[in-house]
């Protein structure tokens, strides 16, 4: 997952459904191609951490340049409590015109509450990722503008110090585990205190790739045996001392930025959002200066490994939705903004500041890797631009509940408090008791 928190979805649903009973949403009167006219219009749009998250202002300014009569005014929310605050504003009628969908899990809740406008009439460019995550009962309720995917970050200098060849894009999980062992031995022999791997404490570091890659994977099915080999690989690396153990990571509140950015680890699986952070921190000195690159995440089998294939990974989109209670006179302008946010021009604007857009093509890739501090090797470009990305969080009303008990399973396995088999069996039982056939 990205550094986000799940809100209490049950509470959100109750608040939104109550709001839906008291008023009805306006009906879309124009499609994404309709003109907003030339009259001055001000749209409000939600965002968070505006001083350190430039994507909102970047898109608002670029859109205004193309549509001088339309101003997009940003409304800042606390990043940690974003969805709780947004739920309250939607229920009270204080939410902005355009709502940034930070967490996919809330889409069904907002849609069921009648809080989002149906934007199915907005035509999206071919090849855009993440659109299906915003579809509920056949209707689209948001448009993706960014799509982060998980890749393998690696420190080229530490690989060289350990005398281990860099990743070549062909690794399976067995190759990854083998490389971790060689790296750990090589780094120790070279007198380095760095570990081969840093695995953050999130459940997604194991489960996200299992869900995307393993045969029979998918959290909505309620049977989690398919995750077993992924936990076996993770525990093997941990037990061999090639990474800080889970209890150390959680007790000491280690950060992935600090561990990789300060060269405490040679490899780390993380989402592409970290690229912009690492470039920025190397520029400010908060991260060390070293040579780094990206490779595809290790694959379940050789069928998807290698640069002649399409590697499988995971990640959720971030998108824009329209408040169902927007002034009808602003609907066309809001849809024009969503149409722009999904366009190639918007993708280039995002790529130029190190953000991974939902639309990736050769021109966008060139723009992204022209950013000062970005890696320039061909494998990094391949890893960033070529992949099949499955959602971390399926768009389903039960997703938040399922992810909660799967997080408990993850903690039990990685901390050693339960065996893999026992923890998976408990998760299967939790699905039956908490979700069942709902």
For the regions a language model picked out, list residue spans one by one.
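Conserved N-terminal structural module of periplasmic/extracytoplasmic solute-binding proteins
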Residues: 2-108, 166, 286, 301, ...
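Short helix-initiation/N-cap motifs at beta->coil->alpha
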Residues: 76-85, 105, 171-177, 247-261
